[in-house]
Amino acid sequence: MTRSLKKNPFVANHLLGRIEKLNRREEKEIIVTWSRASTIIPTMIGHTIAIHNGKEHLPIYITDRMVGHKLGEFAPTLTFVRHARNDKKSRR
């Protein structure tokens, strides 16, 4: 179910503050965050945000096509490990 249009998009306060501060100073630096639930807003375009995937922070460059999506959508938490090619038993 999508968020109601009456409400504003969720963005963590610490993340919003850091982005506004960098926009005022016109600087670009990597912003480290654990907030995967934050929505990408237009003021984030052009910044690089390192999003936590449970193990490490993945740097993601924010573009205009990402606006409206959540940060967590761009940092996958699971990695699929393939079965060995010669292991017939586990591939059944």
Swiss-Prot record:
Major localization listed first in the record, in broad terms: plastid
This protein's UniProt keywords: Chloroplast, Plastid, Ribonucleoprotein, Ribosomal protein, RNA-binding, rRNA-binding
GO cellular component, one term: mitochondrial small ribosomal subunit
Keyword Transmembrane belongs to the record: no
HAMAP family: Ribosomal_uS19
Function: Protein S19 forms a complex with S13 that binds strongly to the 16S ribosomal RNA.
Family note: Belongs to the universal ribosomal protein uS19 family.
Identification of the protein by name: Small ribosomal subunit protein uS19c
Name of the gene this protein is made from: rps19
